[in-house]
Swiss-Prot record:
MF-aspect GO terms: damaged DNA binding; snoRNA binding
Chain intervals for the UniProt region annotation (Disordered): 182-208, 222-362
Keywords for this protein: Cell cycle, Cell division, Coiled coil, Cytoplasm, DNA replication, DNA-binding, Mitosis, mRNA processing, mRNA splicing, Nucleus, Phosphoprotein, Ribosome biogenesis, RNA-binding, Ubl conjugation
Quaternary organization: Interacts (via PIP-box) with PCNA; the interaction is direct and prevents ultraviolet light induced monoubiquitination of PCNA. Interacts with FBL/fibrillarin. Interacts with CACTIN. Interacts with SF3B1. Interacts with U2AF1.
Pfam families associated with the record: SDE2, SDE2_2C, Sde2_N_Ubi_vert
Tissue-wise expression: Ubiquitously expressed; enriched in brain, lung and liver.
Keyword Coiled coil tagged: yes
Residue ranges the record marks as coiled coil: 109-149
Entry-annotated residues carrying Phosphoserine: S266, S278, S326
Protein name as annotated: Splicing regulator SDE2
Modified residue annotations for Phosphothreonine: T274, T319
KW Phosphoprotein (keyword) present: yes
Amino acid sequence: MAEAAALVWIRGPGFGCKAVRCASGRCTVRDFIHRHCQDQNVPVENFFVKCNGALINTSDTVQHGAVYSLEPRLCGGKGGFGSMLRALGAQIEKTTNREACRDLSGRRLRDVNHEKAMAEWVKQQAEREAEKEQKRLERLQRKLVEPKHCFTSPDYQQQCHEMAERLEDSVLKGMQAASSKMVSAEISENRKRQWPTKSQTDRGASAGKRRCFWLGMEGLETAEGSNSESSDDDSEEAPSTSGMGFHAPKIGSNGVEMAAKFPSGSQRARVVNTDHGSPEQLQIPVTDSGRHILEDSCAELGESKEHMESRMVTETEETQEKKAESKEPIEEEPTGAGLNKDKETEERTDGERVAEVAPEERENVAVAKLQESQPGNAVIDKETIDLLAFTSVAELELLGLEKLKCELMALGLKCGGTLQERAARLFSVRGLAKEQIDPALFAKPLKGKKK
């Protein structure tokens, strides 16, 4: 007996839902869909079949009264959305903060968590108070406990003993060093004070042999009368060595030139009157130190005093002839008798110092030349003072600003500042050699103008 045909419902795009009867009861889904697509004139490959929302195999038998849905297939694209979906899912899974979410009752989880934490904190309030009170009691107990001191430490006692011994040794060494410095300072101070004492003694011993500067023709006879003996002695010992040269500057109408090379800048020249058979009277500046040096040199060379005098006279006459033609006027320097005495005393002191120098050192004595360029320079050279004769800064201040400036310039030091500053600067180099002076006190050399 033939099986009854099955009646099924088919639903698809474009025709809605309709009932279709199959040819036989054992008809497959593939045959049923293929015949329907032919009737609708659509390709069967563009659909897939679902039954009750699930895909079915096309080889299954058609069920009576079932509803079959034809779902059109979508044309697949290039793809690439899968990677984006995976990245988004990873970000969602990474976060653990769900407080912004809401529970089933609509409350945010953040508020719910805060209420739970507040209830827990209120519940533990009593425990916290008890713990705080316990800590306070423990702190009081620690403060009330007496410290355990140990006063029998052998190491500490040993350290104290060693420190006491080292302190005693250090004090003794310091006292010895201080006493040695005091003794050396007293010795050096005594040595510095010997020079003024010696100069005062020499001043009293040689008061009869005083010499003065020749101020002009009007005072020539007075100078000859008062210093005849000393002039005769000095004229015999006139210097003629290679290290000493003489030039006669023109003074007044006589036309005699007077200049000399000195062993040191601080020594003073003294005038000696010498008669050599001519009506003109020659005046030659001589220093005690130069006389000693020249006598030794003449003794070594075997020259006689007469030969030395004749050579000196010849050189002086030649110089007079040359200077008489030029006729350059030179201002005379007014000098008092008291100033001449002080200068002569300083000359004797300097001469004695040079005389005490060894013979081999006398040959190395520096020779300075008097400059006659300007009257101001002549004043500076002639009035150079002996700093050893001053014992305080106040005495140097009595010299005045200009005199202190000249002395500082002669030493190559800075000459600016007030009267007190100049006097203090000059007093600080008293008795010091040029190498011992602080380099900061020297004046800076003048720089040429840039072209």
